[in-house]
Amino acid sequence: MSATPVVSVVVPVRNEAGNIEPLVKEIERALTPEGPFEIIYVNDGSTDATSAELQRLAATRPHLRQIRHRESCGQSAAVRSGVRAARSPVIITLDGDGQNDPAFMPAFLAELRKAGSGCGLVQGQRVGRKDTAFKRW
């Protein structure tokens, strides 16, 4: 990938082999109209086929990269590793289990462009979640 990406998408994962390809395709559908982008999966010590699946997909997708933690360091550390590796100053983080819909990303990018250079963060909140009271706390 030669052009600087418009956005870097950081996806921390651990043992999510079955979710990787569907999420990659959703991200691609959402971001292809936006210009060059990169997807950085941070494999946080997976013990399943996550690494092999990422390697398979990356073979035909120059915009897809994998960073590997040899052992699980936790989601925050995985996000930090991905952010450090990002080539774009604009970074979106997504959970690797498909809970966040990548279709929202163009709207976030539009809000960021509308806000101008003084904006450092655009944030969203999922609605209609079915979490327990403890998780909401």
Predicted features along the sequence, with ranges:
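N-proximal low-complexity "stem/linker" segments adjacent to membrane-targeting elements
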Residues: 1-29
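Structural signature of the Rossmann-like NAD(P)-dependent dehydrogenase/reductase core
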Residues: 8, 43-46, 68
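Donor nucleotide-sugar binding loop of glycosyltransferases
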Residues: 16-19, 46, 75, 101
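Acidic helix N-cap motif at the loop->helix transition within catalytic regions
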Residues: 18-22, 48-57
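Conserved donor nucleotide-binding strand/loop of the catalytic core
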Residues: 36-41, 51-85, 125
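A conserved acidic beta->alpha catalytic loop
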Residues: 43-52, 98
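Acceptor/aglycone-binding surface of glycosyltransferases and processive sugar-polymer synthases
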Residues: 69-85, 93, 99-137
